Amino acid sequence: QWGLSRAVLKPRISATAYGTYLLSPDLGLSQSDWRHLNEVGGLVQAFVPEVETQGELSLVFIDGEFSHAVRKRPARGDFRVQSDFGGRWEAVTVAASVRDFGEAVLLAASRSWLYARVDVVETSGGPILMELELIEPQLFLTPSAAVRLADGLLSRTRPADAASGMPPDRSSGVGLEQ
């Protein structure tokens, strides 16, 4: 009906690919699956075959700056990259063009986010957006990235020092809950 050989059907709100299906002419959904999607709402996304061969890149941004990236790959015979379904991930270095694409996606979201994850797939035509995760994404944090996230959170929640306009110095532990 949409001119797609395969499509991904997802609930409008979900986590960890719960309730996500790969649709093709020979695959159908049970009546209970259709009822569930009708209740929660859903969306259809063109299936990008590169997910099976190259995986999906997650670009993590903390306090408006690119932090790190991971490549998520599905288990053999599956299309979902989440570990709950056998997917695996590894830290990677991404090309500047891919990082620039992620930054452009965040700029289009027109807000300063404390954290964000931009999921993309690299195709012969360039990177394409799969999802923009802003609510509660898995961030694949390293210790240094966790510190940047904590610093960003503190700078947004602590009152600025009246004289300097800067957040309080936390290096001495002063002002931190013990």
What feature does the model see in each segment?
Residues 4, 61-62, 115, 140:
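Tryptophan-centered motif/residue detector
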Residues 16-111, 121, 128:
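Phosphate-binding site of ATP-dependent enzymes
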Residues 110-113, 122-178:
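C-terminal active-site "lid" helix and adjoining low-complexity regulatory extension at the edge
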